[in-house]
Amino acid sequence: MHIAALHQPSQVQLNQDGNLKHFLTIEGLSKENLTKILDTAQSFLDDNNNLINRPLLEGRTVMNLFFENSTRTRTTFEAAAKRLSANVLNIDIARSSTSKGETLRDTLWNLEAMAADIFVVRHSSSGAAHFIAKDVCPKVAIINAGDGRHAHPTQAMLDMLTIRRETKKSFEDLSVAIIGDIKHSRVARSDVAALQTLGCKDIRVIAPNTLLPVGFSEYGDHVRLFNNMDEGITGCDVIIALRIQNERIDSPALSSQSEFYRMYGLNKERLSLAKPDCIVMHPGPMNRGVEIDSSIADGEQSVILKQVTNGIAVRMAVLALSMQGQLQEQGLIEAIAL
């Protein structure tokens, strides 16, 4: 997908009142939409960063449909749904009827007939979640848990919540560096879109040319490209390290992993170029000794494990808000008391 195409707004995910009914992509959502997600997620965390259970989805059924492997995302969605008192079903795609030749459309229609309220979908095809929400199951709340190289909106929102909680600064005042495989990363696309929407004016993308997407220069005035990592991270408030997406690379993009670490690996020496209170993030899974050194991943400036906790809160928020938006759309309720 040409990166400029991601700026086309998608109103499929909003109901007639402008509230979330699906969560498919950051693009097309306003600052107010994103802030509502962050504020709702914040309400599920106490002052000590402990999660707060609320039975907002009691009697509702959430189905996790992961057509790609996942550990953190699937598990945190399950944890989020259970903390909202939902019934959770994890569909084993490898053993489902899709492996027997059934179409995706027929599989989803059958699952919808089982009284599913929310589908959490991860798929290797870009646009899969949008297709399901628009053309297959519009009355089921569809949450995009990652579609190809396109988008990973809940990861972006948990990253934004982590940045907001840990830096205690306005997004307008932050310098954020994203380092690694930008070309194949749905996280990078969604993070950049969320940062732009929330007002960040200094977004630095650091990568070799072979790991940058076509059309990068069209992404926005506040996004700058750096091939030199030392230059790119100097004075940053936030560093987000990304792994190399080997499973999505068709032809060799690097001479070796050791060469990537030498040029772009985050170590103590490089981190010292950022601000003293710079936080270090990573969406996982990490490849230690490739994009990040263990001393940094496990160090005092790392907030990687806090991202995981924040991910549950964000996914609780997205599940609750999307269910509310669907019920509003269908004229069944005015609002859930969030």
Curated annotation (Swiss-Prot):
InterPro entries: Asp/Orn_carbamoyltranf_P-bd, Asp/Orn_carbamoylTrfase, Asp/Orn_carbamoylTrfase_sf, Asp_carbamoyltransf, Asp_carbamoyltransf_Asp/Orn-bd. The keyword Transferase applies. It catalyses: carbamoyl phosphate + L-aspartate = N-carbamoyl-L-aspartate + phosphate + H(+). One of its GO terms (molecular function) is aspartate carbamoyltransferase activity. Its EC number is 2.1.3.2. This is Aspartate carbamoyltransferase catalytic subunit. Pfam families: OTCace, OTCace_N. Pathway: Pyrimidine metabolism; UMP biosynthesis via de novo pathway; (S)-dihydroorotate from bicarbonate: step 2/3. Carbamoyl phosphate binds at R72, T73, R122, H152, Q155, G284, P285. It is an enzyme of class 2 (transferase). Belongs to the aspartate/ornithine carbamoyltransferase superfamily. ATCase family. It comes from Acinetobacter baumannii (strain AYE). HAMAP family: Asp_carb_tr (MF_00001). Catalyzes the condensation of carbamoyl phosphate and aspartate to form carbamoyl aspartate and inorganic phosphate, the committed step in the de novo pyrimidine nucleotide biosynthesis pathway. L-aspartate binds at K100, R186, R243.
